[in-house]
Amino acid sequence: MDALTTYPGSITHRQPLFRLSAHPTHHRIMNVTVDPNALAVFLADVRDIDVQNLQYVPFMRHHLADLLVERLGDDFADMLVELVKDRRHGGFTIGLQDLSQDPSDFVKFGTAIGHILGPSNHDAMSGTYYARFVVKHTDNSDSYLRQAYRLFTMHTDGTYVSDATDWLLMMKFAEQNALGGESRFLHLDDWEERDRFVNHKLGTRPFFYKGSDSKNVSEQIERPLFFQSEFGLSISFIDQFVQPSNREETAFLRALSRSMEASAGTKEVSLPVGGLVVLNNYFYLHGRAPFQPNESLVRELMRQRGSFAY
């Protein structure tokens, strides 16, 4: 078996209530399939927990994680954490398998998955621990997030906030008349020109980041592009919010961004409605391909970001 699809040592390849398999379109992230009966019981368990309760009471989010682990076992939780921390993989996809179309169930399932990894960050854009947003034909926002027909360039999350952003979760809530718009992922170790930028004199020099007005974050953060973390070589970058101070820095950042976009290691991944993806934010960059123009285009997504509990 290829080293990139070898399962982490403590992970059992097949369990009665869940199955781990290679992702059909990405050579690193894995696909997790859960027994639908166990998943249906979890949805019944959380039926009377309302979303506002989750927004107001942080421990209820962890309670959802406990309820999911009760149905699927500690091995399931250990597997998810290990997948995201393992540099060979660093992420997974999982979904509700058409068991529900209720957005509240999507929030609860995504919250349970995220809080198996650890606590979520406050999302200043939405004012709570997650953000839901719609991409459609027209948009007048001040960032690429909702702009359907632009390339949403490769980036990491959490660049302009002081909170640790260890993991990122994105879940598809709805989609109509959408062609294109695939998620794009780049693992640092698959970027052919990485070392050219790491070894540049600006590669580890701090840059300032400042979010746009819609992000509702006033602080300005200074951080290097490349750095060492517990996961090895790591990156923090977003072209929209980094603030170069001269033409040399501008040329370097522009070349870095263009190199990532053109890399053969940048792969497209599609999600079904009710599906989600989790990535390690230290060594994955992510973006989105442009949609094909359609006046009736709608895609709704949920974002959660957080830190590892252990």
Language model features: what each stretch is:
Residues 2-72, 76, 86-91, 132-273, ...:
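Active-site environment of non-heme Fe oxygenases that use a 2-His-1-carboxylate facial triad
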Residues 73-120:
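N-terminal functional module of multi-domain proteins
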Residues 100-147, 153:
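Long, hydrophobic, well-ordered secondary-structure blocks that form the structural core
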